[in-house]
Amino acid sequence: MEKPNFTGLSHVCIFVDDVKDAFAYYERILGAVPNQHIPHWKNVGFFQAGGFIEEAKEAEVSIGFMDVPGTKFTIELMCYHKPEGRKEPIVFKANDISGARHVALKVTNIEEAFEYIKAQPDVTLINTTDDYKVYQISKTEPSEFYYFDEAKENDAQAKQAAADILGNTKYFYFIDKYGLQWEFEQGHTDIGD
């Protein structure tokens, strides 16, 4: 049996109550650009693949895709009309076990991005006290982490560079109106695309 042969990240799906409203919402808070809309779609194969085998013939969904400029990141918006699911998002604490916890996007203007998100009426910062702001990761030593790759682990200069990058990373978190937690980060240049 062969392992999957991945070619890239396809998308992250966000379940919403109205795709058109969600287009406008993510356009406003992320600058995301609508790419495709499949309104009130009735596709038996889609629903069967999604686990709705018995309900597939009556099922209906609206789907939208958005691109986040400056990234290879695609957001999929999905609203099930039939069968209906729970209507209120569940918001977990940052340290709760619950599957994927957040989506992180890299920015070049972290302070301005924080003020912009903070001013939005329908997002919640992960900490609502006045003390919450953009924070920088404290100085990190190479001894605080390890690489699985032996050559990287034994390269003291590369480990110091990675520790310096990590120690210069700034970030903050917020939760959108659909319950998805987002991280905006600046400086963590050694991971992601």
Task: Enumerate the predicted regions with their spans.
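A cross-kingdom feature marking solvent-exposed beta-strand/loop segments within repeated
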Residues: 41-52, 84-93, 144-163
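Active-site-proximal beta-strand elements of phosphoester/diester hydrolases
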Residues: 77-79
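Short, ordered secondary-structure scaffold segments
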Residues: 94, 98-100
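Eukaryotic phosphotyrosine signaling hubs
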Residues: 11, 100-102
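Vicinal oxygen chelate
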Residues: 1-5, 14, 37, 75, ...
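Core segments of cupin and vicinal oxygen chelate
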Residues: 15-72, 112, 119, 132, ...
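A short acidic/small-residue loop/turn micro-motif
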Residues: 42, 82, 188-191
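Loop/turn position at the start of each blade in beta-propeller repeats
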Residues: 7, 61, 98, 167-169
